[in-house]
Amino acid sequence: MLIPYSPHTIWKTICATLLLSLAFFSQAEQDDSVEFNIHMLDAEDRDNVDLSRFSTSNYIIPGMYYLDIRLNGRDFPRQNINYIEVADNHSVACIDPTLLKKLTINQENQKYIKQISPDCFDISQLPGISIKNDGGVLDITLPRSLMKYEESDWTPPELWDSGVSGLIFDYTLTGTSTRPNKGNNNNTLTGYGQAGLNLGEWRLRAEYQGNYSSEYSSNNRFDWNQIYAYKPLPDLAAKLTVGETYLNSQIFDSFRFTGANLQSDERMLPPSLQGYAPEIHGIANTNAKVTVTQNGRLIYETTVPAGPFVINHLQNTVQGQLDVRVEEQNGKINEFQVQTANLPYMTRPGSVRFNTSLGQSSVNNHKMQGPLFYQGDFSWGMNNTWSLYGGTLLTAKDYNAWSLGIGHDMGRFGTLSGDITQSYSKTYDNEKINGMSFKLNYAKTFDEYHSTITFAGYRFSEKTFRSFSQYIDERYNGINNNGYEKEMYTITGNKTFWADDAEKSTTLYLSYRHQNYWDKNTQEQYGVTVSRNFSIMGIEQINTNLSAFRTQYKGNTDDTLSFNISLPLGSGRNIGYNLQDNNGKVTQMASYADNRDYNNLWRIRAGLSSDKKANTDGYYQHRSQYAEINANASYQQDNYLAVGATIKGGFTATRYGAALHSSSMTSSTARIMVDTDGVAGVPFNGQSTTTNRFGIGVLTDLTSYNNVDARIDVDKMDQDIETRKAIASTTLTEGAIGYYQFPVRQGERLMAVLQTTDNKYPPFGAEVTNQKGESIGMVMEEGLVYIAGVNLNESLNVIWNGKTQCSITIPAEITDPLKHQSLVCQDR
């Protein structure tokens, strides 16, 4: 039976809705019991009202509830909350020990917490606390004066989430095919990634890499780089690693070993005490593959379009010297080295940062080499401005080293540190040698000048100084492939001019690195980048960029100059001009780029080189819920044709489900598995992922130990999808797989009029729930109810007086959801 709208019905519906709104408002704002004026309802309905559950402020019917948790505006996963009655018409929420720990109540205010049972604590008497149960959310708000920690931009350890157990597999595959006019064709395929298993707080990881070349078959291989396990130790603000790993020290040079490492993890500290990850700047003359390695281990690989590039996805745990290889599609290979930034080893007053390892050096085939060693270093904050640091590296024989240094915070003049390292070792010929190495580091941010000297350092090593890896190569293999360093100095900095004027704002980036050796050629790299946005002749946001780099490496000198200008056409499209000079060969290109669709970006270019040869190239990037794909192609007249692609993807599985997804950038990032109760196609975080047919999606590349959000893109959802909750926040430990279930429903919407079998309406305020117990509607006057997110023929329960009284069945067909459906509520 269809019942049309009438002005009288609409007016009654509005009044009923206002009445319920006032009920909830009174519930939240008053401390006394609430009485409702039901005379605003029709006389025939005044005796058919069930508002008993609203009559006492904050009264919740005793029982177990499955609720989302919100602490001071931060969301946590659902959990069972038991409400118990403590007096007539008064109930309190039982806070279990785990949730109580997350509140981080300081010792002074513990006296206000009442223990009712070992698993039940009453926190309602804490001064200034607010506890609300609204819309399936237990919302607790605490004054910061009650809490242990005052930092508003930092999540304390009690609130960290170790995630759920599960399997992960991430991969990056890069393929190229080159067809030169002269010589042989070459097809290559490289890949790297990680496989892993999370068990509680332990993370087991196996990192792999592989190479294939049709032209150079001797390079074809597949290796498991390292297999290790690690676990965060929040009480120590440290990380324990066992297995194959690399020494990560701010004092001693990195090397590969098998053993155990216990190290302070500064990511667990407040942001003001944390470091940063290194950046790599360069210029690609054509579409190119950029590879970053350290001691033969592949750390990062990607494809970049022609022009200046910046790689800033490296872990902040990467220390020491990095090898960068840029493989152009025209066959040219450019190599250089980057020294990662090493901030002065400063520590907060009275605190100690430490790093200790025990193991044996190992080579890439997992074989041990060299003696058993112990390494330990520390930094102690003596006071607000001075830190003392040092360390030792000891072996059972043949090699020992110690280091001692001091750091000073000079206030507005920056931070400076200096240290000395002494080594004692034996050569391949059993010759005993010893030497010293001296190092200075400086860092300063000039906020008032919008400038930063990110790192300035100097190091001098005597000819007889040996790092541990040099000792292993020399003592056991009789070789030294990397040379003996003599002097190294490096500086990187940036400056923003006219930072407060968007029309004039100009950014300058400078870098310089010099390394000479006792036994090989000097290496140098220096570069400058200037970028500016400006407007002219009514055209806004014109972008210009000028970059120049010189690299001297292995006796070769490479000079590159690049100038770019881009003019917006509106709606994410732009045209541009590029001039590039590589060792005197000039290429000029015109380009068109379309960035309107974030998930599908592309650019094409065409132009001429100084030898009158035509050049053209293109670049396309596609982001999907399953992987990220970067494809490129380039052609140079009478020279070559090349195509390439990179695919980054991953797979995550837990007991809640599994999903393919875009790849995780590094092994140290976290991820969140989102569950939408089987509803497919729900987009999250700007469409970073979309749930699959099973209602599972995975958000990757989330920063560990920082607050992160999983957000449903409500404006992008299909019309037949609804959710009671659109955002969840958490702070995940390193490598964790977070899990959050969102109450999402997909289905029909309808207005219905409910009647019992004796032709009476259910009482005003009765609740309609599905078989999961989720509330999906509330009965208003004359049995009117709005229902959403239900399936055809689905059975629903109607509850009043604290129990299910009858059930209704959604029709097999709904022709018009705006017309009232008459549904009979069958007795239970």
Swiss-Prot record:
Keywords: Cell outer membrane, Fimbrium biogenesis, Membrane, Signal, Transmembrane, Transmembrane beta strand, Transport. One of its GO terms (biological process) is pilus assembly. Residues 1-28 form the signal peptide. SUPFAM superfamilies: FimD N-terminal domain-like (SSF141729). The keyword Membrane applies. It is found in: Cell outer membrane. One of its GO terms (molecular function) is fimbrial usher porin activity. The keyword Transport applies. GO terms for cellular component: cell outer membrane. Coiled coil: none annotated. It is a multi-pass membrane protein. Its main location: membrane. Belongs to the fimbrial export usher family. Involved in the export and assembly of PMF fimbrial subunits across the outer membrane. This is Outer membrane usher protein PmfC.
